[in-house]
Amino acid sequence: MVLSQTLQTVQDVEGVLTEMVRIGRTCIVSIPNFGYHQLRRMLAETGRAPKSAGVLHYEWYNTPNIRFFTIADFEDFCREKNIRVHRRIALDTEAQAEVLEHPNLNADLAIFVISRA
C-alpha cells in the first residue's frame, strides 16, 4: 500500500496508518516536512503562513492541510504506535538529492517504508 503526500490532510492519522499496516504487510508513506528550513525561514521573516511549490501552494484559508508535522514528529509517532520504520529516505526535491545530514531541517519530503512492529 502507498500513501503519497496525503497524511497531512487526514482527520484520523492513527486510524489510517493502523489499517494500512494491518492490511498491507509493508507500506510506503511519503510526507511533506513542515520543519524544512525554507518554510521556517519564510514564517520567521514574513510573519505569515509559508507558501511554496507542492503541498504549500494554497493560501492559509483554503488549504486541505490540517496537520503540520515534521519528519521527527512522524518518527516519534511511529515509535509510540508500535509501527516499524524499515527505511527513511529524506529528500530535497529542489536539488533532486537525498538529504543525509539533519533531514528534519534540510529535507522538504520524506519517504518511509513501514510495517507493524
Name each region found by the language model.
Residues G15, T26-A53:
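Conserved class I S-adenosyl-L-methionine
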Residues M1-D12, I31-P32:
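A short SAM/SAH-binding and catalytic strip from SAM-dependent methyltransferases
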Residues V10-E14, I71, A97:
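Structural motif corresponding to alpha-helix initiation and N-cap regions
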Residues E75-A117:
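A C-terminal cap/extension of S-adenosyl-L-methionine-dependent methyltransferases
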Residues L17-M20:
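Class I S-adenosylmethionine-dependent transferase superfamily signal
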Residues M1, A44-R48, N104-L105:
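Short, hinge-like loop/turn segments at secondary-structure boundaries
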Residues S52, L56-D73:
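Acceptor-substrate binding/catalytic loop of class I
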